C-alpha cells in the first residue's frame, strides 16, 4: 500500500484507519477536524503535512508526500484524532493517591483543598475542562475529554508533594511504583 515505508524501525500506526462510532459525528474542513460525541465537542488542527479524509464511518490519515517530516506527522496526527474520539465517547481518567499521616483531600466548590503536611492547606483551583472527584479523603480522581489537560492537571496536583523515596509519602499516581531507598546505616 505505501511502498515508500521501507524503514523497519518506523511505527506503522498511521496506516490504521480510525473507526468513528455511531454516536460520534466527525466533520473535516481542510486541516480542521471537529468531533462531536456524547461527552462534548472537540476541535483539532492537523499538520499541513498530512491529508485527512472521512470515508463512510472511518477517518483515514495519509501523508501528502514522501518527506521524513510528513511521515513523522502521519502517525502523531492519527493518534491525536483517535484520542479526540475516545475523549468524546468515554473520556479520560487519572487517579491519584495521597500517602502520609494526615494527608487529606477535600472538594470545596471549585477548589481542591489538600492537607499535605505543610503548615498550611494547599488550595488547587480546578480548571473548567476537568471534573475532579474525591471518593475517599486519600484518593483523587480527575476526569475530562482532553487527555492532555487531564494529564497536566494530575501532574500539577502531584507536583504539590511528590512521593519521597524513603517512606513513600506524597501524592502518586495509582499505578505508579515509587522506588524505595534505604536509609543511612551506622
Which residues make up each language-model segment?
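Ribosome-associated RNA-binding proteins
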Residues: 2-186
Amino acid at each position: 500500500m505505501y511502498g515508500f515505508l521501507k524503514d523497519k524501525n518506523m511505527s506503522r500506526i498511521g496506516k490504521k484507519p480510525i473507526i468513528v462510532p455511531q454516536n460520534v459525528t466527525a466533520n473535516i474542513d481542510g486541516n480542521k477536524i471537529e468531533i462531536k460525541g456524547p461527552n462534548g465537542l472537540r476541535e483539532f488542527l492537523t499538520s499541513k503535512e498530512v491529508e485527512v479524509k472521512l470515508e463512510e464511518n472511518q477517518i483515514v490519515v495519509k501523508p501528502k508526500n514522501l518527506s521524513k517530516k510528513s511521515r513523522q506527522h502521519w502517525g502523531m496526527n492519527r493518534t491525536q484524532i483517535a484520542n479526540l474520539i475516545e475523549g468524546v465517547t468515554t473520556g479520560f481518567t487519572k487517579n491519584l493517591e495521597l500517602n502520609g499521616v494526615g494527608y487529606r483531600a477535600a472538594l470545596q466548590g471549585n477548589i481542591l483543598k489538600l492537607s499535605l503536611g505543610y503548615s498550611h492547606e494547599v488550595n488547587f483551583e480546578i480548571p473548567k475542562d476537568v471534573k475532579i472527584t474525591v471518593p475517599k479523603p486519600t484518593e483523587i480522581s480527575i476526569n475530562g475529554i482532553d487527555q492532555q489537560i487531564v494529564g497536566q492537571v494530575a501532574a500539577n496536583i502531584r507536583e504539590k508533594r511528590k512521593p519521597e523515596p524513603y517512606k513513600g509519602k506524597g501524592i502518586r499516581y495509582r499505578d505508579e511504583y515509587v522506588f524505595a531507598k534505604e536509609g543511612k546505616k551506622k
